[in-house]
Amino acid sequence: MIKDNQMFIIDAHSHLWLKQDTTWNNLKIKTSEGNSSRSFFLDQEVQMLPPFMIDGKNSAEVFLSNMDYAQVSAAVVTQEFIDGIQNDYLMEVQRRWPDRFLVCGMCDYFRPGFIRQAESLIRNGFRAIKIPAHRLQLSDKRIMMTSPEMMQMFHLMEDCGIIFSVDLANGDTNVAEMKEIIQECPRLKIAIGHFGMPTTERWQEQIRLARNEHVYIESGGITWLFNSEFYPFPGAIRAIREAIDICGIDKLMWGSDYPRTITAITYRMSYDFVVKSAELTDEEKGKFLGENARHFYGFNNLKKLPYIKNMSE
């Protein structure tokens, strides 16, 4: 429970889509027929959504209901190749609820000429652009984030004040590329997702990137990375404490990775383990759960949401 006037909660990493029907690395991702809460994912059927979302629609309306109940004031909606490019739907979402959502656009980085897509996204009002860098490694090739066209896009984003949202591959795989991007575009605001992949070796190298002025870390996916522990995720708390020691609490933001993570836990549980932790101070919790994201993403007109008692209480 978040008491009145205590803190704003902002989710820095979530996903929305109306239907999955795409391919990545020549493998299919598609909403299942029948029970559409499941999807055929790469080589198996998985529970992609909570089992009661049987229409397969991961809509903003359902997410807002979860956000309101969990007292989450706003959310950043990012993108992933496995969901298909969702630019049209996400812009509709941002236009309908501008005070609740900041959405990320995404280009088809596998096809030359994507800089034109980036220019169009910026013209259409996207304030952030996403690269799922861990998906740029394919069976037969790897797309480098330091290619001439990528660097052209980053310079454009820097000049236009567009945020670069990125999920990196395990450990330090992409760190050298990121260092080059940061050096080349020092004013580019960067949010690194999945908390640096803290269950992999050399994950701290991703966190060290946040020692640069405009680089932040968000924790989207941290509960699935520590899923084997389950709630209250003591390993995740230890990772947060270690990250604080590396780059400071002011550079860290909470993210849920909704909706995939709530196939295992409730939406509130995806941050409640932080609220209840004795290993973090109240000031650290406030910054991590919302204050830092409010500053970084520029959320204005946020409102505090009331606590709604549930029928189990």
Tell where the protein language model's regions lie, with residue ranges.
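Active-site gating/metal-coordination segments in enzymes
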Residues: 73-74, 81-172, 216-224, 229-230
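Conserved, mostly hydrophobic/aromatic
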Residues: 13, 67, 90, 121, ...
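Histidine-centered divalent metal-coordination motifs
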Residues: 13-19, 167, 194
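Short aromatic-enriched loop/helix-cap "lid" or pocket-rim segments at secondary-structure transitions
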Residues: 20-25, 88, 116-117, 141-143, ...
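Short, acidic/polar
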Residues: 56-66, 111-121, 202
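Short amphipathic alpha-helices and their capping/turn segments at secondary-structure boundaries
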Residues: 1-9, 19, 115-124, 202-211, ...
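Mid-to-C-terminal alpha-helical segments outside catalytic/metal-binding sites
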Residues: 2-12, 19-69, 74, 241-242, ...
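Catalytic pocket-lining loop regions of alpha/beta-barrel enzymes
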Residues: 127-128, 143-253, 295, 300-301, ...
